[in-house]
Amino acid sequence: MTLALAAIACMLSCSKDDSKEPSLNKTKITLYVDETEKLTYSGNDECTWSSDNKRVADVNNGVVTANHVGTTTIHANNLACEVIVKPRYTSFTEPYLEFGSSKSEVKSQMSGYTLKSEDNTMLTYYGKGNVDNYAYQFKYGALEMSAFYTELSCSLSLSDFLLERYLVFDSEKSSTERIYTLVSVDLKMFIQFRVGTYGCIVMYTKA
């Protein structure tokens, strides 16, 4: 009788342990680019880790590494943790980037800036802070390209700003300038960063 009761107790105990609900120690984390944080999975089953967008943040055995500015989700089996990656460099304000927008929509978004020039295919504005000018190019009435201009002295800080947000796709160098082609973390936008004696130009187009 004693052995039978002990066996039943053991079976009940094992059943209780086996039914333990899996859990993740955090469901949302915020990191700066290049920071890491360890997530802990608790459960009886083996954990498989994955990231919805490794270009934003990757995970290796629970250690999350922030790669570029953006938001993604880390999965631990069927559990999830939202990861928000924030920038360290915020010295520049990018232009309006909703490609396909009308000229009136762009004007509305740039209402806080002074219009510099306008024609059928272009809008330019005086910038603020580290940005000298903004430019918008239209094709068939729809926004096709956005750009901003800065002084050459801003090239290093602008490079840091862009590398936190975008992936380098290609680069080339001539006697007068350097040209870097980057792509957004969602692979939907190309960015061209040009540096020369004239200063710095950053141009954005739809991929």
Task: List each model region and its residues.
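Bacterial N-terminal signal peptides that target proteins for export
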Residues: 1-2
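C-terminal motif of bacterial Sec signal peptides marking the signal peptidase cleavage site
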Residues: 10-13
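Short helix/turn-capping signatures at newly exposed starts of structured segments
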Residues: 15-36, 54-55, 68-69, 77-164, ...
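Short, solvent-exposed loop/turn segments in extracellular or other extracytoplasmic domains
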Residues: 58-63, 120, 175
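Extracellular/luminal low-complexity segments enriched in Ser/Thr/Pro
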Residues: 60-73
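Short, exposed beta-strand-loop hairpins at the edges of beta-sheets
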Residues: 75-77, 179-198, 203
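Short Gly/Thr-rich strand-loop-strand
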Residues: 164-183
